[in-house]
């Protein structure tokens, strides 16, 4: 029976154990009867509860029952005393009925108790309150009977409720903890898990129960000695009443079981944590080796262009993003495993290290595959980027070669050739870079089979290899075609350079010939002072003509070369319509002027030779000297020469040009006239010698 069940009855204080003891150390049970009618049933329940509190040892020392009848009637007292034989155990040794101050019929009362003495089994005495000290020490009596023992029924009841609650909770908790702890000690792991799972959490908090027990024990220990004036006053919460040793025993048992329970919880928590780690590890491993690896298996291509490679990179970044979430779980698990390893539980070290190694191997392998794939796609993107740049360079070079250029001069041709060479060199550099990128990509692809998870990647690799080699071969062919076209264009440009050079040199030949003509007309005007000088002038003139002839022939050859080059270049020669007529015109003018110069020099030679013969004194040939015809011939040649000096050179186009200036012609004519005068004088001397002598 628990106090909480009959709490309303206990609050009525129909009976109580004050904690006092008789001289035999037996407990004192007090029944305070009141004026109101006492319910025997409630009193019986109260007595049953109170008598269940003391230990068997206490009960063996017997009870002294004080029935306080001072405020009650005799019939009630009698009924209570008679009821004690059914409620109070046989160890009751004495019942003290405290009589009121009013007179009871002694004979009746004595007769009644004496009559029932044998049947009651205990002694019943009537005593006044002030006479109780004959049987019980004052310190063991409450203040109601003139004693010094302090008793607070409600305080006792509250403490009793606490005690019973603690006892009930601690007993139940001990059973639960024992079940849990015993279940955890079983050898069969399945039974252990089943028992722990079913009863792992106690119905009450062990910490709370322990705290309640300690507070209760502290209260019991403090209330044991609460007397005044240095005297000892026995508390109603004495250990014999509320079983202080029982509280201590319960606390000891609770501490022991709770310590075991905490260890079980720790082991359970560790096992749970280990199982959770193992489960998470397997989740990471299964995903990485399952869906994660499948994602990588499905991504083998490298794309056939920059856009395709970028699309594959974007897809790979999505795959990496999914992997990053699992790698984050890996980092967290690795930290948890490291913490457990540092805890130093030997029994779990092997399993933890195995899990850690398995997790690390899978994660590092998957991370390596992701990095390899990323590097492969980056290499493919760079390869396609170089290929695209090279293709654009080849397109630009091809476009430049396909346009038929018509440069204005050799300088522009040289500039065009330089630009072609630079573009071709840039193409060479780009092709070399493409080969390097392609070879690096091929090397990476060749290593792809090392992490193929058993998948045959021959087909995928062959497609990638064929694509890379195809791109490089295509670029090589395009570059070779451009080189061939550059060679053709270079030859054409060089021919055009030769054409421009020939045209330029031909124009220069015309200029030179014009300068020779100008020099002939302006400076080649002297006819010599005598035959010898004139012959020298004639010889120089012939050499001068040879120079002019060479210049003309050189110009003709250049113009013929331009015709051949134009035919080769399939273009119209600009020299044939301009330079060649100019060359021919100047040459004809030079020829006419040269012939005129030759005629004049030859006439001058004839004039000077004949004149010199006549003027020289040659007695051996008097007949010759006297030939009249010679004088006439000399005179005729002289006149013809003078006349010729006044006649301009008439070119084929009808234009006229004089040799030298009028003053130059006058000087030459004057010299001829002087010579003619000498010849005439000589003629006269030969005709009339006497005139010469007379004059002398």
From Swiss-Prot:
This is SEC14 domain and spectrin repeat-containing protein 1. GO terms for biological process: negative regulation of calcium ion transmembrane transport via high voltage-gated calcium channel. Residues 1-153 form the CRAL-TRIO domain. May act as the primary docking protein directing membrane turnover and assembly of the transient receptor potential channels TRPC4 and TRPC5. Binds phospholipids such as phosphatidylinositol monophosphates, phosphatidylinositol diphosphates (PIP2s) and phosphatidic acid, but not less polar lipids including phosphatidylcholine, phosphatidylserine, and phosphatidylinositol. The binding to PIP2s is calcium dependent. Might be involved in the plasma membrane localization of CTNNB1. It comes from Mus musculus. The gene is Sestd1. Gene3D superfamilies: 1.20.58.60. SUPFAM superfamilies: Spectrin repeat. Spectrin repeats lie at residues 275-378, 381-494, 500-602.
